[in-house]
Amino acid sequence: MRIEEFDYELPPGQIAQQPVEPRDASRLLVLHREGGFLEHRHFYDLPRYLHPGDVLVVNETKVIPARLWGYRAGTGAKIEVLLLTRQEGDTWETLVRPGRRVPVGAELIFGRGELQARVKGVTPAGGRIMEFSYQEGPWEALLERLGEMPLPPYIKEKPADPGRYQTVYAREEGSAAAPTAGLHFTPRLLKELREQGIEIASILLHVGLGTFRPVKVENIQEHVMHAEYYAVTPAAAATINAARARGHRVVAVGTTVVRTLETVATADGVIHAGSGWTDIFIYPGYRFKAIDSLITNFHLPRSTLLMLVSAFAGREKILDAYRVAVREGYRFYSFGDAMLIL
């Protein structure tokens, strides 16, 4: 398939710059795959589409203040560093700008010198492997003080509350970007779903370069995903498998959940607990094993995320739904509105 098959026109004014308040007041475009018809709702209407016994699977990853501003020792050149994946100890895979100023062996200084880094290598994707050093920890406290929340470049203004770029159920630190489908949930809505008999299972996928790396090839099958860390507990696997065995639906909250479950599922849809790294790339033609419904935001043109939802619902149905969403004034991308694909 060609990359241009996943293009669409979006007026810049429909790229959401701030989240709505409350979270579940965002709009919800419901796409019924069977029949292809659409409904216009709000996210707080979600309970009417779920049934007792269904299991909602969420990603409990937490975004870290992964953007650091520093300078190169010796030259004073200003350098931007985005932490992607922790490898071992204080060694991280990172993206740097401008890359030409950061060769192997370069030393970087952050803050007033309380955090330093040495470039140990270059990744195939053009990133840098950096080993950080500091005299006074802990690391998390240093990041909180020196780092910034790594908002996507299309968001031009910081949210008044940085916590709005976290889900209310975020637990495990490690992501360079939020699993945005989950941003619409409130504690009240989760409570309502539980009281309705909806099971909620938590998995983990730390969002890194694999989720938002642009596709630079014409033939999408040639694109190579960057690996991201995932974990599925025995309890989560048991909850999901029990729901499916009883004939209930597995509803994935976001593409990160889809990629995790499809990674650990057998051919007949049984979920196995475990952890590791996944570089699964889902595009039209893929046969889903693990999920029945999907909650997701509106994604960028030509992105792997748009390809994934097109694989699930059909490319034409998705692009038709996007055209309707544009016409009806829906808000797009990370702080935008949501879709429920049934």
Swiss-Prot record:
Keywords: Cytoplasm, Queuosine biosynthesis, S-adenosyl-L-methionine, Transferase. Gene3D superfamilies: QueA-like. Its EC number is 2.4.99.17. Pathway: tRNA modification; tRNA-queuosine biosynthesis. The keyword S-adenosyl-L-methionine applies. GO terms for biological process: queuosine biosynthetic process; tRNA wobble guanine modification. It is an enzyme of class 2 (transferase). Belongs to the QueA family. Transfers and isomerizes the ribose moiety from AdoMet to the 7-aminomethyl group of 7-deazaguanine (preQ1-tRNA) to give epoxyqueuosine (oQ-tRNA). This is S-adenosylmethionine:tRNA ribosyltransferase-isomerase. It comes from Moorella thermoacetica (strain ATCC 39073 / JCM 9320). The gene is queA.
